[in-house]
Curated annotation (Swiss-Prot):
The gene is Stx8. It is a single-pass type IV membrane protein. Residues 1-215 are cytoplasmic. The keyword Transmembrane applies. Widely expressed in all tissues examined. One of its GO terms (molecular function) is SNARE binding. This is Syntaxin-8. The lineage of its organism: Eukaryota, Metazoa, Chordata, Craniata, Vertebrata.
Amino acid sequence: MAPDPWFSTYDSTCQIAQEIAEKIQERNQCERRGEKTPKLTLTIRTLLKNLKVKIDLLKDLLLRAVSTRQITQLEGDRRQNLLDDLVTRERLLLASFKNEGSEPDLIRSSLMSEEAKRGTPNPWLCEEPEETRGLGFDEIRQQQQKIIQEQDAGLDALSSIISRQKQMGQEIGNELDEQNEIIDDLANLVENTDEKLRTEARRVTLVDRKSASCGMIMVILLLLVAIVVVAVWPTN
């Protein structure tokens, strides 16, 4: 498996910091002997610039790894602690280069960092959880990749559930549209039926009126016939 670029850069940055500490110590020893040190000073200044570039690169790599979930938040915090230590060492080295710091403290800090790289207990590992305690970088990275895969699987399952719910919602919406269409058709049918009933009722009323008129006419005709019969009926 290819090495993690962050840790590769971190290792090279630590080497630069260690080299700067050694060069500063060498320069100070030369100055105590009254020797000129322009070449050493130029070398140290160049190494300090390289150290700053490396630290900025580590910051960018860490930010990208955390934002894209390539590593867990726990691992991100652990790397941030390592990065903070490098930033502190950079300030100490710069102060010592400018003769503003204590050389013994600077060299001791740098050597302690190198011993930590070789296996001396690291103060940030004292509170390390059981899941990662005693594991190497590759093993921790594999564990993180497994966690990320599990998280991705969970997100895929959640996405599938949401998709099914969305599909069910669309189906329910389509069914409601169909029910609304049926209700609209029934409403139109009821309205048409009601109109037909009103029309038939008007026809029945008209027929009733005509029937009543015909009855009156028949009565009148019968009365006329009766009058005529009585008039022509012989009295003897």
